[in-house]
Amino acid sequence: MNPTCKKRMGAIRLETMKVVAQEAIAPAIFELVLEGEMVEAMRAGQFLHLRVPDDAHLLRRPISISSIDKVKKQCHLIYRIEGAGTAIFSTLSQGDTLDVMGPQGNGFDLSDLDNQSQVLLVGGGIGVPPLLEVAKELHARGVKVVTVLGFANKDAVILETDLTQYGQVFVTTDDGSYGIKGNVSVVINDLDSQFDAVYSCGAPGMMKYINQRFYDHPRAYLSLESRMACGMGACDACVLKVPESETVSQRVCEDGPVFRTGTVVL
């Protein structure tokens, strides 16, 4: 057995979680509510590795956590149907169960931020959900939250109303069918504010822009999406290169999914 895999297996948490509810919130995008003891260990920016309840699909699917309720022991996951596995997830309803591994990943660093702090959240498409818990937790501390969201079109817009509870929200669409026409850079490049921290998640093009725009920022973070196989750091399916190194690499599942800008090659 790979020694990395063996090391991780002792720390993996597996649980059969109960489906509390599920609904479609946009075309091919669903919000799934799960309940279980694992919720107590969850942090903003982490993800769960879900087993498809079908013997034909062996690999788990990584789904980011959008919000956490430790009192109810419930978490919300928002995902897009990308293939047969996630299509099966969309058929689940109240009372069903899921085999869950997690919580996985490092999550966002929300330390040392208070009512004197101002943060920028940047999300695109299905990368928006992980930012909801960040906004909720920081708003509760009195942190000023500014959010910029990017979508392909009006039909793809999600979580705008939810995020507006926690601060100012700008929405952009590629075709101009809703909000500001263009991508998130149209808004961000015009913002005069200095931000104590930046948290982002989205498509590769957006992440490259954030990485360049805030390259030297001491607290700018990228939550990266990647295809995964084992989810334990053993298979090297989600490896990223490190700047100025031919030998050192980072794994999205184990070392991420959150990385500080300038620390990985995009």
Task: Please place each PLM-identified region on the residue numbering.
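Short, basic/aromatic-enriched C-terminal tail that caps enzymatic domains
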Residues: 13, 249-266
